[in-house]
């Protein structure tokens, strides 16, 4: 298609024709004989408020990424051949460069898309259909040369095209809604009762207090929220919501107030919220697009003092409400927001993002489709996930679930992921009007079997990691090394099991030969027939579990939830941490400021460690808690998990007291203890498994003074290297974990703290710990606290106390 550029205007709208004219001018200035899709794409990208640039910014939020894309297009244009006549050389050229074949094909694709997408256009002849800018952009992005340039700059053409299509659909929806007659008093899309009930059910769920409702049309979402408010006013809701008060805020008319005005309004809001603490408050923020746009234009909202921003101040104060810092643990507070999918994607961007600051979870509601349902959305993608069948199967399998709360959350997440992946595979190839019949006739046996396999898998993982003390009947961690069954294996039998690499698993196959069966439980010892072939990932902790690709990808998705909170050392983060921790342990408030500084310093990357002579940034935090106030230690650890990682589910405690003792024992007890230490998982191995399962959390290691010598050495190496190694030689990175080593004090050098060289290896029954001396002599001239400090430092021969980032002495609680 070699037609001149002036003849193209007949097939384009005014805006699209203007873009093509600018592209022709660009080609003429560069001396190019033809206008290509590269010229058009470069022209559209140069417009600061253009649709293509906006879509690219949504795909990559960093503005320098778009600058890199512009440079890549510039390089691609420089590679195009120039004609003999060039205005840069003073040689005249043709007044209108011709349209290249690639651009002509793009026009045809856009015209075809335009014709298919409009009923009015289908009734017109092909030459009468005018191409709009949106369809031109989508067609240009399909061009191979444009896709190649975008790929070089780190962009994905299909992803950017999706953003453009979403923007077009939102614009159509808003135009249709605004053109509806107000006197009719009805929305274009009727509010479905099932959507309203799902929002109410979400409000009843205690685990999902802060959420944003996402949909393609804000009018539909707003209609659902108004219906919920009407039901609350009529008391047509569950008992827990009957006295709840709605507070709706409108920020669109907020303007640019001063700092005093903002603080006054926030104080009024806080007072209003506190006045309803007994009844409950639902704070409706409305459309979150105002916050997103205001943060993007942050520089224009700054006052004369460059260190203060109105929007950031409001966001942080609302975050305190969302995190429960104002109403406390007993307050009933919900945070609700509305957003289109386009807006919510931008809520997930920024450092830190609105999603992380407000602990937002997501609900999505379709604009028109009656086949979709309001359902939970993953934090990584805005997809509708149908989890009704999974919940039913979980209820049917409730008698088989015996794992802890932490593993239960991961199990449910993996089950929903498995269900959604199966449903996507079975329905993607069918038209919408056939999918409901496919679902009715779908055989559910496969899903049921998959759920049962997940139950077995997570029961095994939880038993091997979090419920190790429950294996006392297997002699692996029992202080008395006794079986409750009728027969007791000999020492040589247990030693044989240990040397052959036994694993405690939940075994359902009754035809295993190499197993020791406990009569009262279904736990068995399974000896792999081929050790080299039975190795699995450390996160499984079970060589008999079946890990397929879907399960592995689900575990990877779990690891992606590592929070990016509190990654900067600034006054705002420090104040937030201090306020939250002091509210939990006011009697230990003297320790809080230094503790918060330690966490922020480590997480911001300010601290470094030397590895092989090189300085390496560290993000993991190591703290040593000493003292008798066990309650304060755990409260601080749990609050750090809630603040930094978003939930108290990100807290795990490893306690040695279940399988360690430092008291004087008989010869038989000492022999059994040595056998137990050799055959059970050591303290450092339990820690390494916890890190491998999920490093992005707070790990409280209790009774560290009772840990064996090798475990203490392992902890010190983990502090120095940022990685922890298990007995198999596999390493796991600590990433940004917060590790708290806790003890009352290092009182005396017990057998557990002594190096292995001090222990006898001849197997004699003499109690070698009988005449153990204390680390220091008692000096009556020293105070009790000073004596404890000196005693602890002298007992720490390994240097663990000096290796951690900070040490904190907890004074006894006054209560």
Curated annotation (Swiss-Prot):
Tissues where this protein is expressed: Expressed in roots and seedlings.
Q: Which domain of life is it from?
A: Eukaryota
Residues in domain Clp R? 8-171
Q: Does the keyword Ubl conjugation apply?
A: no
What UniProt keywords are attached to this protein's entry? Repeat, Transcription, Transcription regulation
Q: What induces it?
A: Up-regulated by strigolactone treatment.
Motif EAR per record, residues: 778-782
Gene3D superfamilies this protein is in? Clp, N-terminal domain (1.10.1780.10), P-loop containing nucleotide triphosphate hydrolases (3.40.50.300)
What family is this protein classified in?
Belongs to the ClpA/ClpB family.
- Record text on subunit structure and interactions: Interacts probably with TPL/TPR in an EAR-motif dependent manner.
What this protein is called in its record is Protein SMAX1-LIKE 3
Q: Which organism is it from?
A: Arabidopsis thaliana
Q: What is the lineage of its organism?
A: Eukaryota, Viridiplantae, Streptophyta, Embryophyta, Tracheophyta
Gene giving rise to this polypeptide: SMXL3
């Amino acid at each position: 298609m070699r037609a001149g550029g002036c003849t193209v205007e007949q097939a384009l709208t005014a805006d699209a024709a203007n873009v093509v004219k600018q592209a022709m001018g660009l080609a003429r200035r560069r001396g190019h004989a033809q206008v290509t899709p590269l010229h058009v794409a470069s022209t559209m990208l140069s417009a600061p408020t253009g649709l293509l640039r906006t879509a690219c910014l949504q795909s990559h939020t960093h503005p320098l990424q778009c600058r890199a894309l512009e440079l890549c297009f510039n390089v691609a244009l420089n590679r195009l051949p120039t004609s003999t006549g060039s205005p840069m050389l003073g040689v005249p050229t043709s007044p209108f460069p011709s349209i290249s074949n690639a651009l002509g094909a793009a026009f045809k694709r856009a015209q075809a898309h335009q014709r298919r997408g409009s009923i009015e256009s289908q009734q017109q002849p092909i030459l009468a259909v005018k191409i709009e800018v949106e369809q031109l952009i989508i067609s240009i992005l399909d061009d191979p040369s444009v896709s190649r340039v975008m790929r070089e700059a780190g962009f994905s053409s299909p992803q950017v095209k999706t953003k453009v299509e979403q923007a077009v659909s939102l614009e159509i929806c808003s135009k249709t809604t605004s053109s509806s007659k107000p006197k009719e008093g009805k929305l274009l899309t009727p509010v479905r009762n099932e959507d309203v009930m799902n929002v109410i059910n979400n409000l009843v769920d205690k685990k999902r207090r802060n959420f944003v409702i996402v949909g393609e049309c804000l009018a539909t979402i707003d209609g659902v929220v108004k219906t919920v408010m009407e039901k609350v006013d009529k008391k047509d809701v569950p008992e827990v919501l009957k006295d709840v008060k709605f507070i709706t805020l409108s920020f669109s008319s907020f303007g640019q107030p001063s700092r005093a005005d903002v603080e006054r309004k926030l104080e009024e809001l806080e007072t209003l919220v506190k006045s309803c603490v007994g009844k409950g408050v639902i704070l409706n923020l409305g459309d979150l697009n105002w916050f997103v746009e205001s943060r993007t234009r942050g520089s224009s909202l700054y006052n004369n003092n460059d260190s203060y921003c109105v929007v950031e101040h409001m966001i942080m104060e609302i975050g305190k409400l969302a995190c429960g810092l104002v109403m406390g643990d007993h307050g009933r507070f919900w945070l609700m927001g509305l957003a289109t999918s386009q807006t919510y994607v931008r809520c997930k961007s920024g450092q830190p993002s609105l999603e992380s600051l407000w602990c937002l979870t997501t609900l999505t509601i379709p604009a028109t489709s009656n086949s979709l349902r309001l359902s939970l959305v993953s934090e990584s993608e805005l997809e509708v996930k149908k989890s009704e069948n999974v919940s039913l199967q979980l209820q049917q399998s409730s008698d088989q679930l015996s794992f802890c709360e932490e593993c239960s959350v991961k199990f449910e997440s993996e089950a929903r992921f498995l269900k959604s992946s199966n449903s996507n595979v079975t329905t993607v190839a069918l038209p919408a009007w056939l999918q409901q019949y496919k679902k009715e006739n779908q055989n559910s046996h496969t899903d049921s079997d998959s759920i049962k396999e997940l139950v077995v898998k997570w029961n095994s993982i939880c038993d091997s990691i979090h419920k190790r003390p429950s294996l006392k009947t297997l002699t692996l961690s029992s202080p008395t090394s006794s079986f409750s069954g009728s027969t007791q294996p000999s020492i040589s039998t247990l030693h044989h099991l240990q040397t052959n690499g036994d694993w405690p698993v939940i075994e359902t196959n009754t035809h295993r030969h190499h197993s020791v069966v406990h009569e009262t439980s279904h736990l068995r010892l399974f000896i792999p027939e081929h050790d080299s072939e039975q190795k699995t990932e450390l996160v499984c902790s079970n060589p008999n579990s079946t890990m397929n690709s879907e399960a592995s990808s689900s575990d990877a998705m779990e690891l992606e939830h590592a929070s990016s909170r509190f990654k900067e050392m600034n006054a705002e983060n420090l104040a937030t941490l201090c306020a939250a921790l002091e509210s939990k342990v006011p009697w230990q408030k003297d320790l809080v400021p230094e503790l918060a500084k330690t966490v922020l310093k480590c997480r911001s990357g300010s601290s470094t460690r030397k590895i092989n002579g090189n300085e390496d940034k560290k993000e993991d935090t190591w703290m040593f808690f000493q003292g008798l106030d066990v309650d304060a230690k755990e409260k601080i650890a749990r609050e750090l998990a809630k603040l930094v990682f978003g939930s108290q589910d990100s807290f795990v405690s490893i306690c040695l007291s279940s399988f360690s003792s430092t008291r004087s024992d008989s010869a038989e007890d000492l022999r059994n203890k040595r056998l137990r230490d050799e055959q059970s998982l050591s303290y450092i191995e339990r820690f390494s498994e916890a890190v491998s399962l999920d490093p992005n959390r707070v790990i409280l290691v209790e009774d560290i003074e009772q840990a064996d010598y090798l475990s203490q050495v392992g902890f010190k190496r983990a502090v120095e290297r940022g990685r922890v190694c298990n007995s198999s030689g596999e390493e796991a990175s600590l990433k940004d974990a917060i590790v708290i080593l806790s003890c009352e004090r290092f009182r005396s050098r017990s057998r557990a703290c002594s190096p292995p060289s001090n222990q006898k290896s001849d197997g004699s029954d003499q109690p070698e710990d009988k005449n153990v001396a204390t680390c220091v002599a008692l000096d009556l001239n020293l105070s009790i606290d000073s004596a404890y400090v000196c005693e602890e430092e002298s007992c720490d021969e390994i240097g663990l106390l000096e290796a951690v980032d900070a040490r904190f002495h907890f004074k006894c609680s006054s209560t």
